[in-house]
Amino acid sequence: RLSLVGSEMCIRDSSKASLSEIQRLWSGLGYYSRARNLFECSMVINSRFNNNFPESEKELLKLPGIGTYTAAAISAIAFNNRSVVIDGNIKRVISRLFFLKKPIKSNYNEIWRFTNLVTPDIRVGDFVQALMDLGSQICKPSKPLCESCPLILKCDARKLSLIHI
């Protein structure tokens, strides 16, 4: 019997389960499309990747329900591959750090380019998680805690007193 609580469910286990069993286990967690994607991913990983979770963004994008952000995040955080990860927090940090003038919502390519410039080749997962934490805890959407920011001396928006971005 499968359980999501108190044990580790491996790809092999989930690929042997039925969709209804995965959905039953998922009950109460919300986002029910994720249960279906988990089931479908396990099938693809079992058949196409011999039960080995793919590590590269390119391979991860072949999995159902995995988009650009999720593929980059898994590749960087789980496998420490150099991937450019961009979530809402990272967009805000990068936009302020380099004082990118276009609105965040319409500036993905420029944000990607600058994020790529600062993404290291080593300890990528640590870097990505640190940027996410920085954006959620210090470089907040409103009332950022600039005085607590480790990047205060490098931040172009702060230098220009334009932290409203």
Segment roles from a protein language model:
Residues 1-11, 163-164:
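Single conserved hydrophobic/aromatic residue that forms the stacking wall/gate
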Residues 8, 12, 20, 36, ...:
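Generic alpha-helical secondary structure signal
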Residues 12-64, 68:
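Alpha-helical ds-nucleic-acid-binding substructure associated with the helix-hairpin-helix region
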Residues 10, 25, 74-77:
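Short coil/turn segments at secondary-structure junctions
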Residues 56, 66-162:
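Contiguous mid-protein beta-loop-alpha structural module that forms a pocket-lining wall or clamp
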Residues 6, 16-19, 87:
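ATP/adenylate-binding site constellation spanning eukaryotic-like Ser/Thr protein kinases
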Residues 8, 21, 29, 42-45, ...:
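Alpha-helix boundary/capping residues
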